[in-house]
Structures are given as structure tokens and as C-alpha cells.
Curated annotation (Swiss-Prot):
Organism taxonomic ancestry: Eukaryota, Fungi, Dikarya, Ascomycota, Pezizomycotina
Sites where the protein binds Zn(2+): H64, H72, H81, D84
Name this protein carries in UniProt: Superoxide dismutase [Cu-Zn]
Basic and acidic residues bias (residue ranges): 126-137
Stored InterPro entries: SOD-like_Cu/Zn_dom_sf, SOD_Cu/Zn_/chaperone, SOD_Cu/Zn_BS, SOD_Cu_Zn_dom
Cofactor remark: Binds 1 copper ion per subunit. Binds 1 zinc ion per subunit.
UniProt keyword list: Antioxidant, Copper, Cytoplasm, Disulfide bond, Metal-binding, Oxidoreductase, Virulence, Zinc
SUPFAM superfamilies: Cu,Zn superoxide dismutase-like (SSF49329)
PANTHER family attached to this UniProt entry: SUPEROXIDE DISMUTASE CU-ZN -RELATED
Length: 154
């Protein structure tokens, strides 16, 4: 079992943790989040980005992690970036607790997300269905108010 965690910080009140667990290279990865301080009653995009670089805030994280050269999509789509995790839903206080299992996110192997950045976006991910070029790259999920580098945990 490999475990990893990212502590979310940024230029906003959004804080939280995102944890990753994978039993072995062929198993799906469970991604869990506990996020506070976001917009109330909203759906917000969450993605793994290419770089573990936050020297210039969350913009330094680069584009979505996309080792197979695909276009942006929903987590359930065959055509998607590895880093495409879709949206999470916040409650009336702007908090979100949840989890998802994903078959493309890996902690083990050549396409590992370790050392990369998880980004929480200010807008809703349109899952690549927005009808424009930006939708096929980012899901039109908007600015990056919080992020954290994914690192090995106990």
C-alpha cells in the first residue's frame, strides 16, 4: 500500500487535504478530500497538474497531468487527461468531504502523480463539453485559488 497526501494552500481562504491510497500498480487509487473555505453550494474543479512547482503560486503547476496526450474529459471518460478528477460539491458552509476511486491516477509506476500538484479551481469543470478549445484543455474550471504538492505519507 502506497499512501500520499497534499496539503492545500493558496491565495484564498481555501484550505484542506487530499489523500491518495493505492494497494499495488494494477489497483485503482482512492482519492479523498477534506476542503474548507470554498464557495457555498457549488461544484468546483479538481485536477492533478503536471509539475510539483508552486514557486509562483498555483500557476507554476502547469497544465493538467496528461502523459498520454489526450483531450480534457470527465473522470469516467476514455478520452481524458490522467489528472482529470472532475468536480467536488461543497455544502452550505463551503466545505467538501468526499472520495473517488480512479483507475488512471497512480502512485506506483511511470505515470505516478507523486511530486505533482493537485489544484482546486475557482469554477466548475465542464468536463470537456464546453464547446470551445479551452474546454478541451482545462474544462473552463477557472483560476487556481488553492493547491498542494502530492507527497509520500505514512
Amino acid at each position: 500500500m502506497v499512501k500520499a497526501v497534499a496539503v492545500l494552500r493558496g491565495d484564498s481562504n481555501i484550505k484542506g487535504t487530499v489523500t491518495f491510497e493505492q494497494a499495488d500498480e494494477n489497483s485503482p487509487t482512492t482519492i479523498s478530500w477534506n476542503i474548507t473555505g470554498h464557495d457555498a453550494n457549488a461544484e468546483r474543479g479538481i485536477h492533478v497538474h503536471q509539475f510539483g512547482d508552486n514557486t509562483n503560486g498555483c500557476t507554476s503547476a502547469g497544465p493538467h497531468f496528461n502523459p498520454f496526450g489526450k483531450t480534457h474529459g470527465a473522470p469516467t471518460d476514455d478520452e481524458r487527461h490522467v489528472g482529470d478528477l472532475g468536480n467536488f460539491k461543497t455544502d452550505a458552509q463551503g466545505n467538501a468531504v468526499g472520495f473517488v476511486e480512479d483507475k488512471l491516477i497512480k502512485l506506483i509506476g511511470a505515470e505516478s502523480v507523486l511530486g505533482r500538484t493537485i489544484v482546486v479551481h475557482a469554477g466548475t469543470d465542464d468536463l470537456g463539453r464546453g464547446g470551445n478549445e479551452e474546454s478541451k484543455k482545462t474544462g473552463n474550471a477557472g483560476p487556481r485559488p488553492a493547491c498542494g504538492v502530492i507527497g509520500i505519507s505514512a
